[in-house]
Amino acid sequence: MELATLVTLFVSGLLMSFTGYALYTAFGQPSQQLRDPFEEHGNELK
């Protein structure tokens, strides 16, 4: 394969891995440990 193809595949793989990890953190098991700033402040915005 050409160098440009390998670099493109590598960068695409990194991007897909980062996106998958971000989605897992946002919606998967670790998301239960995230704090919700709106719940902490309640109805102070009214």
From Swiss-Prot:
Gene Ontology terms: cellular component: plastid membrane; thylakoid membrane
Compartments, record wording: Plastid membrane
Positions of transmembrane segments: 5-27
Family of the protein in this entry: Belongs to the PsbN family.
Keyword Membrane applies: yes
Predominant localisation class: plastid
Coiled-coil stretches: none
Domain of life: Eukaryota
Function comment: May play a role in photosystem I and II biogenesis.
BP terms from Gene Ontology: photosynthesis
Organism: Cuscuta obtusiflora (Peruvian dodder)
Key words of the record: Membrane, Plastid, Transmembrane, Transmembrane helix
Originating gene: psbN
Protein name: Protein PsbN
Membrane topology: Single-pass membrane protein
Pfam family, one: PsbN
